[in-house]
């Protein structure tokens, strides 16, 4: 049988990425052009800046991805692209490039949900067994997803306010840490003690919903009040206390979901899945199901994960027309 090569595009936020997947599971290339340095001075992603950067580098990313994969444009079988959720301007750059490539070469266009990409990045570790449960944690999302089969995603719980990664970045900014702050907070947390009593919202409620706005506000108030009084707080202890509260919330809801949905596999994915503290808690506390976490290189935004997620869409012949548009608020269905 002739080999299949999927060329995948990811431009939902501040990473321009193009990847090539051979058949179902051989990632030949995964080129990522990061914009973090451009956004650091703003303390967050500036949509207009992100879009301009995507335009500047996407052609070079395509060329590099094909070269690294050792194939030519004529070898590509299909084109996959993130069409949401994300920043509308950023999404449109990737969509335009993907549609142009597919149209020029007469190839099918595969639409991929960005969060499905994060989830299916776990396929790079080992073949996934369904049904499974996934905890998706990133800068824009915190949700528990039940996956009955590849491509069938249902939200069973999600945040009511801030995403967990967003909370990390906001408290990081208060402490004067560099954006994005997640990795630095994680490192500092391992050097400090959990001595500050931060709230764990909804942790005892019998649902699968998350809330991080109260925790974020409590942190900011503590830090602000200490500054007003001229008191010095240990950054390491602040980080340790904040992270302990975050992980308590994530673990409580995840374990509750595993009780409600008896599955054999838990996938933990998204940018926050790179968090060392979270990985340690999962290893220690979730021992009765298989826990699969994508490798660090596939935790952040990348086109490799979009390629993995596109396989199930290819198998279902779920192809898009040339009128495919960006859907910045695209979401999985909610479990009824």
Swiss-Prot record:
EC number in record: 2.3.1.234
Binding positions for Fe cation per the UniProt entry: 114, 118, 301
Main location: cytoplasm
Keyword set includes Transmembrane helix: no
Catalytic activity: L-threonylcarbamoyladenylate + adenosine(37) in tRNA = N(6)-L-threonylcarbamoyladenosine(37) in tRNA + AMP + H(+)
InterPro entries noted in UniProt: ATPase_NBD, Gcp-like_dom, KAE1/TsaD, Peptidase_M22_CS, TsaD
GO molecular function: iron ion binding; N(6)-L-threonylcarbamoyladenine synthase activity
GO biological process: tRNA threonylcarbamoyladenosine modification
Annotated substrate binding sites: 136-140, 169, 182, 186, 275
PROSITE patterns the UniProt entry points to: GLYCOPROTEASE
CC annotations in GO: cytoplasm
Keywords: Acyltransferase, Cytoplasm, Iron, Metal-binding, Transferase, tRNA processing
Cofactor binding, note field: Binds 1 Fe(2+) ion per subunit.
Cofactor requirements of the protein: Fe(2+)
Top-rank taxon: Bacteria
Compartments where located: Cytoplasm
Family: Belongs to the KAE1 / TsaD family.
Cited function: Required for the formation of a threonylcarbamoyl group on adenosine at position 37 (t(6)A37) in tRNAs that read codons beginning with adenine. Is involved in the transfer of the threonylcarbamoyl moiety of threonylcarbamoyl-AMP (TC-AMP) to the N6 group of A37, together with TsaE and TsaB. TsaD likely plays a direct catalytic role in this reaction.
Protein name: tRNA N6-adenosine threonylcarbamoyltransferase
Organism of origin: Streptococcus pneumoniae (strain CGSP14)
């Amino acid at each position: 049988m002739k080999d299949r090569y999927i060329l995948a595009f990811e431009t939902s936020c501040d990473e321009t990425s193009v990847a090539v997947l051979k058949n179902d599971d051989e990632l030949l290339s995964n080129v990522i052009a990061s914009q973090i340095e451009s956004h650091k001075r703003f303390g967050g992603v500036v949509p207009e800046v992100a879009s301009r950067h995507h335009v500047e580098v996407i052609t070079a990313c395509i060329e590099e991805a094909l070269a690294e994969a050792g194939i030519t444009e004529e070898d590509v079988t299909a084109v996959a692209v993130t069409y949401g959720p994300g920043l509308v301007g950023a999404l449109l750059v990737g969509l335009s490039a993907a549609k142009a490539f597919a149209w020029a070469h007469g190839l099918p266009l595969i639409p991929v949900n960005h969060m499905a990409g994060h989830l299916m990045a776990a396929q790079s570790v080992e073949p996934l067994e369904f049904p499974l449960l996934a905890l998706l944690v990133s800068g824009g999302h915190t949700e528990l997803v039940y996956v009955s089969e590849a491509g069938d995603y249902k939200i069973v719980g999600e945040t009511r306010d801030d995403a967990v990664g967003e909370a990390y970045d906001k408290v990081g900014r208060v402490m004067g840490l560099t954006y994005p702050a997640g990795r630095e907070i994680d490192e500092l947390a391992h050097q400090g003690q959990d001595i500050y009593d931060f709230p764990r919202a909804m942790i005892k409620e019998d649902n699968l919903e998350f809330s991080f706005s109260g925790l974020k506000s409590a942190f900011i108030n503590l830090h602000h009040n200490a500054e007003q009084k001229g008191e010095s707080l240990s950054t390491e202890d602040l980080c340790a206390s904040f992270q302990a509260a975050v992980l308590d919330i994530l673990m409580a809801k995840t374990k509750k979901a595993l009780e409600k949905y008896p599955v054999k596999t838990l996938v933990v994915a998204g940018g926050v899945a790179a968090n060392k503290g979270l990985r340690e808690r999962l290893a220690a506390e979730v021992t009765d199901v298989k826990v699969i976490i994508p490798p660090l290189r596939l935790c952040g935004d990348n086109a490799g994960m979009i390629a993995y997620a596109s396989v199930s869409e290819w198998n279902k012949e779920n192809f898009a027309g040339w009128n495919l548009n960006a859907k910045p608020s695209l979401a999985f269905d909610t479990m009824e």
